[in-house]
């Protein structure tokens, strides 16, 4: 699957450079990204829980002229190189501030829905390699991800509290375990 991601990134780059049809490879790239069995996310240094080695997905404004973006990687090796290159690691250098979310059993669609609800407008895909900026609304449209609701993973206890309080839960990312650096 990662080969198809690279293929569509290359086709998109060629189309963009030659003023060709960029829409088809762009949409196919978005579909292939969403088909991956696991996606890697840069995690926030600000929300890092040192005791549990967890953090939440990073939304950064360092690229796209300050536009908030969710940092996503299709490959763990590329993500690890990015973490080391930017020193986006724990202080002891044992972990990169990177986490993996499997498509199954919970599906990672909630991360994209949550990121959009929290203000992300872009997806920075594979920074540090042949990166691509993806419009998050377009990504959700192409992959039939609802923009009208947000899927949230709640524990049974959290669900009981929401029902008892009769108000919606706070929209927030859930902590993701860090991956040890190789």
Language-model regions: role of each:
Residues 1-182:
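An interfacial alpha-helical scaffold signature
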